[in-house]
Amino acid sequence: MRIVVKVGTSTLTYENGKLNLEIMEKLVRQIANLLNRGEEVVLVTSGAIGAGMGKLNLKEKPKTIPEKQSLAAIGQGLLIEIYEKFFNEYGKITAQVLLTKEDFSDRRRYLNVSYTLSNLLKWGVVPIINENDTVTVDEIKIGDNDTLAALLASLVEADILIILTDIDGLYDKDPRIYKEAKIIEVVEEFSDELFKIAGSAGTKRGTGGMYTKIQAAKICWNSGVKMIIANGKIDNVLNQIANGEKIGTTFLPMKKPISSRKVWIAFNAKVSGRLFIDEGAAKAIIKHGKSLLPSGVVKTEGDYDVGDCVAVVDHQEKEIARGLINYSSEEVEKIKGCKTHEIEKILGYKYYDEVIHRDNLVILERGEKFGS
């Protein structure tokens, strides 16, 4: 079984920002045990900024990007050094992998990351992964390690993603506010209500709250990966989950997941523009799985070229799909609203009948934006 484990800042650190070495040691011991029983494990770890805070004895997380990046530069080396020390005690080898959004949005780099991680796992190495917080800016930032873990789980075709946090799972209400809140044990479908329940609350030391974890679960759901949210401080939590015991909240994957290529289009590819389409075209795409023809395009935004990823927006201005475009933005501007047989007359040539072929088109349920 291939497992991706994500552990958050709130689990790895104390309230004062310093690393909880006891928790880290227990986590490493559990992962080492999983390796001993034949499982493959990728570890996505937060904590670099928290480790930097502890090193400098800072009590509050700075808000400016340069300060956060400086703390990450201090903390990342410390974090990996501690992990390596603990894993060495169990005879396990680790490899540090720092990623940015471009490693996912660029198809060639995306595949290269896949090959690298596959080799590491084949050799029995534990890849320890974090976003490269020291150099990333908003334009190339993934944003949170929940999303990073989900993208990686899809990339390595994991069987399960386990997100360890400081609460026991997804509740029907915020358990920090409502004592009567009940845990949701299993989620099979995604709805607006589920995202409302998740809210947007995080912790002082973490980046994302439950909302980012639901977004991560959505990526896993489409990718055919089971995801579990559990409390990282439960004794032997990873081994209990690997043994099939019910802990936390389990998000079951869709029965017919989309292809790995379409997962890349939906969640990883950089969006270079937007196509606004009419109601008829939206219905044809969503209800009947049709390709997008130029006749259904009302407006185009952005500067994109052939093969770029664009967002498809319906008449209610909701993003309903993403796809790889067959024509440039200049060409689409000329042929929008036209019939297929008119393309050659207008442009002087015709590449395809479709603006986006259905094989390169991914429907986004709930009309929600994923990535950017």
Curated annotation (Swiss-Prot):
EC number from the UniProt entry: 2.7.2.11
Keywords: Amino-acid biosynthesis, ATP-binding, Cytoplasm, Kinase, Nucleotide-binding, Proline biosynthesis, Transferase
Keyword S-adenosyl-L-methionine: no
PUA domain: residues covered: 272-350
Top-tier EC class: transferase
Residue positions binding ATP: K6, T165, D166, T207, G208, G209, M210, Y211, T212, K213
Compartment(s) where it occurs, according to its Swiss-Prot or TrEMBL record: Cytoplasm
PROSITE patterns per UniProt: GLUTAMATE_5_KINASE, PUA
GO CC, any one term: cytosol
GO biological process: L-proline biosynthetic process
Pathway(s) it belongs to: Amino-acid biosynthesis; L-proline biosynthesis; L-glutamate 5-semialdehyde from L-glutamate: step 1/2
CDD domains, alphabetized: AAK_G5K_ProB, PUA_G5K
Keyword Kinase: yes
Residues that bind substrate: S46, D133, N145
Catalytic activity entry: L-glutamate + ATP = L-glutamyl 5-phosphate + ADP
GO function terms (MF aspect): ATP binding; glutamate 5-kinase activity; RNA binding
Family stated for the protein in its record: Belongs to the glutamate 5-kinase family.
PANTHER family in the cross-refs: GLUTAMATE 5-KINASE, ISOPENTENYL PHOSPHATE KINASE
Function as written in the Swiss-Prot or TrEMBL entry: Catalyzes the transfer of a phosphate group to glutamate to form L-glutamate 5-phosphate.
Protein name stated in the entry: Glutamate 5-kinase
